[in-house]
């Protein structure tokens, strides 16, 4: 079985046997079909599939048939059903397996975080998203297309808010904040406005702005009001997603796992986590939150093993334990 977890910032591929042994893995950059086109994005996956196969001692260059029985691909930017179908068709066309299932990458986080057949997952990493699942297959989802669909936060969004508050503090349009000096110091420039200019001119890569998330946390820990407000706003958004998903699935008053993951949440910053847990307990007192740092590719692999088990081709509890243990050793 071929497990793929392709996020905005990195992609992991694993070749896993039906009993949970990990034969080969590969890691690459982010999966962004909106920048590269679908074919270009799948080409990037193909290179990683070949790398994982090579580690397993397999050569897939000769066209000798499918590499695996099944592909379980959990992909960022597969946000709409039409996108999932398009990507599933594109991956299936590569001939890596007999069957292919594509899902949004947040489902990998959910599966990595719980073996229960129901629950909710919120990812807050480069972006922010949420999914929920019931045993009968019903789901709760959000478009997660950014501000245009009501999203706020994630590392990318928070970083822009930090820049917004910092530059406005410097030019007089906003309240003073320690963020301004902290942003300037982080990049070794004279001011936050100078950082903005450097990003605009290409002197500082825009991709480095995510480095401002720890800067925000530090200023919040030191009591800067603007920084504290941003952290609290992020907590509100995380809980809003989780509570709405729970409500849609009829789980708001039930004992259900709420899996929290992605780089921003995995950092377990105390102010953020305290705010998330307090707010979640107020709206869903029986919810069982858990922060997951297990690589999401484990979730993709577990979903693949679930598929094999449903087809009587392997999988099962022992295989799930084996794949979790294998990745724990690799960490």
Across the structure, where does each feature detected by a protein language model lie?
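Short glycine-aspartate micro-motif
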Residues: 1-5, 68-72, 101, 119-123, ...
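Active-site nucleophile and cofactor-binding loops and adjacent substrate-binding regions
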Residues: 100-108, 123-124, 149-152, 288-298
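Solvent-exposed alpha-helices and their adjacent loops that cap or buttress functional pockets
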Residues: 6, 64, 93-95, 112-116, ...
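Short beta-strand-loop/turn "lid" adjacent to the catalytic site in phosphate-handling enzymes
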Residues: 50-101, 111-114, 257
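ATP-binding/phosphotransfer module of carbohydrate and carboxylate kinases, centering on a glycine-rich
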Residues: 1-60, 66-68, 113-118, 163-331
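Glycine-rich phosphate-binding loop of actin/hexokinase-like ATP-binding domains
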Residues: 117-174
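Short glycine-rich anion-binding loops that position phosphate/pyrophosphate groups of nucleotides
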Residues: 9, 76-79, 126-129, 265
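Glycine/charged-rich beta-loop-alpha catalytic/anionic-binding loops adjacent to active sites
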Residues: 69-71, 91-94, 98, 137-146, ...
């Amino acid at each position: 079985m071929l497990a793929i977890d392709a996020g905005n910032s990195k992609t992991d591929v694993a070749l896993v046997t039906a009993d949970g042994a990990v034969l080969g893995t590969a890691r690459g950059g982010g999966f962004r079909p909106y920048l590269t086109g679908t074919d270009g994005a799948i080409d990037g996956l193909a290179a990683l599939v070949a790398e994982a196969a090579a580690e397993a001692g397999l050569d897939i260059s000769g066209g000798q048939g499918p590499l695996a029985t099944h592909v379980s691909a959990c992909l960022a930017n597969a946000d709409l059903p039409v996108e999932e179908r398009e990507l599933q068709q594109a991956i299936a066309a590569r001939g890596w397996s007999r069957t292919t299932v594509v899902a949004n990458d947040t489902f990998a986080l959910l599966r990595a975080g719980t073996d229960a057949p129901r629950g909710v997952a919120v990812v807050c990493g480069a972006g922010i998203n949420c999914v929920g699942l019931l045993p009968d297959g019903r789901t709760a989802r959000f478009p997660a297309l950014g501000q245009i669909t009501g999203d706020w936060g994630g590392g990318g969004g928070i970083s822009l808010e930090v820049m917004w508050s910092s530059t406005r503090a410097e030019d007089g349009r906003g309240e003073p904040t320690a963020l301004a000096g902290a942003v300037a110091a982080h990049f070794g420039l004279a001011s936050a406005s100078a950082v903005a200019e450097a990003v605009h001119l290409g002197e500082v890569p825009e991709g480095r702005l995510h480095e401002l998330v720890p800067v925000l946390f530090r200023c919040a820990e030191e009591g800067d009001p603007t920084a504290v407000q941003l952290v609290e706003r992020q907590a509100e958004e995380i809980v809003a997603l989780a509570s709405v998903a729970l409500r849609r699935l009829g789980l708001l008053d039930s004992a259900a796992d709420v899996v929290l993951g992605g780089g921003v949440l995995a950092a377990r910053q105390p102010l953020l986590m305290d705010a998330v847990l307090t707010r979640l307990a107020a709206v869903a007192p029986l919810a069982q939150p858990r922060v997951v740092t297990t690589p999401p590719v484990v979730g993709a692999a577990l979903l693949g093993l679930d598929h094999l088990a449903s087809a009587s081709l392997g999988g099962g509890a022992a295989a799930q334990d084996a794949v979790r243990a294998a990745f724990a050793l690799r960490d």
